Amino acid sequence: MSYAIIETGGKQIRVEPGRYYDIELLPVDEQSTHTIDKVLLIHDEDDISIGQPFIEGATVEGTVIQHRRGKKVIVYKMRPKKKTRKKRGHRQEITRFMIDSINYNGKTLVATAATSSAEVVEDSSDEEE
């Protein structure tokens, strides 16, 4: 299993090719590709590369699926024994980001096509019946 740890939006996220993640809002259009070059760690089977703080030449490429808003967080302030109450809500702007590949030293780590192999298994079980 190959994965990388990247930094985006002030947070560190463990990402794998072929999966999507909700990250802080990226200033790019939907359905466009984006490259993140702040890669802190890459784990490829038995090989681990750690940056100080980032790995030079390592990138994570992905596609912006959509821009959306996160769950609403309610902030409620109240002073006891007074009639002072404030209720406010906040919804964070987030981007759903699909990881396409992890690139390092000319090597590209891409997700395997698990869905196509699952379809083959379903087709072979139909033929047996």
Swiss-Prot record:
Q: Which GO terms describe its cellular component?
A: cytoplasm; ribonucleoprotein complex; ribosome
Q: Which Pfam families match?
A: Ribosomal_L21p
Key words of the record: Ribonucleoprotein, Ribosomal protein, RNA-binding, rRNA-binding
Q: Name one GO molecular function term.
A: rRNA binding
Q: Which PROSITE patterns match?
A: RIBOSOMAL_L21
Q: Name one GO biological process term.
A: translation
Quote the InterPro entries the UniProt record gives: bL21-like, bL21-like_sf, Ribosomal_bL21, Ribosomal_bL21_CS
NCBIfam families of this UniProt entry? Answer: L21
Q: Which family does it belong to?
A: Belongs to the bacterial ribosomal protein bL21 family.
State whether it acts alone or in a complex, and with which partners, per the record. Part of the 50S ribosomal subunit. Contacts protein L20.
Give the function comment from the record: This protein binds to 23S rRNA in the presence of protein L20.
Please identify the protein, giving its name as recorded. Large ribosomal subunit protein bL21
The encoding gene is: rplU
